[in-house]
Swiss-Prot record:
GO terms for cellular component: cytoplasm; cytosol; extracellular exosome. Its main location: cytoplasm. Keywords: Cytoplasm, Transferase. One of its GO terms (molecular function) is glutathione transferase activity. The gene is GSTT2B. Homodimer. Belongs to the GST superfamily. Theta family. It comes from the Eukaryota. It is found in: Cytoplasm, Cytosol. This is Glutathione S-transferase theta-2B. It comes from Homo sapiens. Expressed at low levels in liver. In lung, expressed at low levels in ciliated bronchiolar cells, alveolar macrophages and alveolar type II cells. GO terms for biological process: glutathione metabolic process. It is an enzyme of class 2 (transferase).
Length: 244
């Protein structure tokens, strides 16, 4: 059996790995795990990834459970074009520098609007307004750092070409954008960066990867989202409670 990728395109890192694999012609058997239904908390999936998170890559008996590690693994295994994960030591270090900061300051912060506008209401929970405002402030600060520290006057986050850093960042920022947040308004450098990354990836691939998240508000309004399992419901309550 070939490589298996367990994913849900509602998930930002799942989309990053999906886009990377598609763009580079990497053969993967896709296994959809519905996050809203709570399939990532099922006994079957927990036997594959005890952390109960997506994406997860299975290469025979070898299992990887973190998106950045999966991207690096695929890049090296399939010898994708060097710009993604540069062989030059300093250029590669820049990619790792961003990915480390991304895990601390981007990942999680930009996912909170989905909990506020879709997932919380789905289970009858409203996130307190003071938490919503704190999250807006945190996103604004992170965008400023992203623009000033990592983008600067370069075309891409880690240099002159698209890298894994750009892909991870774009997918995280797409989450609130899909929910109506004007993240790029008043930020022409970031807006131009987004345009360059999407142009490189191609409109068709971006639309394919983003179609589910772009339609999730409409699904919520029409009440067509699936009902979470009891296990997922409890996990969702805990996640909402942890919003700072």
């Amino acid at each position: 059996m070939g490589l298996e990728l367990f994913l849900d395109l509602v998930s930002q890192p799942s989309r990053a790995v999906y886009i990377f694999a598609k763009k580079n012609g990497i053969p993967l058997e896709l296994r959809t795990v519905d996050l809203v239904k709570g399939q990532h908390k099922s006994k079957e999936f927990l036997q594959i990834n005890s952390l109960g998170k997506l994406p997860t890559l299975k290469d025979g008996d070898f299992i990887l459970t973190e998106s950045s590690a999966i991207l690096i693994y695929l890049s090296c295994k399939y010898q994708t074009p060097d710009h993604w994960y540069p062989s030059d030591l300093q250029a590669r270090a820049r990619v790792h520098e961003y990915l480390g900061w991304h895990a601390d300051c981007i990942r999680g912060t930009f996912g909170i609007p989905l909990w506020v506008q879709v997932l919380g209401p789905l289970i009858g929970v409203q996130v307190p307004e003071e938490k919503v405002e704190r999250n807006r402030t945190a996103m604004d600060q992170a965008l400023q750092w992203l623009e000033d520290k990592f983008l600067g006057d370069r075309p891409f986050l880690a240099g002159q070409q698209v890298t894994l850093a750009d892909l991870m960042a774009l997918e995280e920022l797409m989450q609130p954008v899909a929910l109506g947040y004007e993240l790029f308004e008043g930020r022409p450098r970031l807006a131009a960066w987004r345009g360059r990354v999407e142009a490189f990836l191609g409109a068709e691939l971006c639309q394919e990867a983003h179609s589910i998240i772009l339609s999730i508000l409409e699904q919520a309004a029409k009440k067509t989202l699936p009902t979470p399992s009891p296990e997922a419901y409890q996990a969702m309550l805990l996640r909402i409670a942890r919003i700072p």
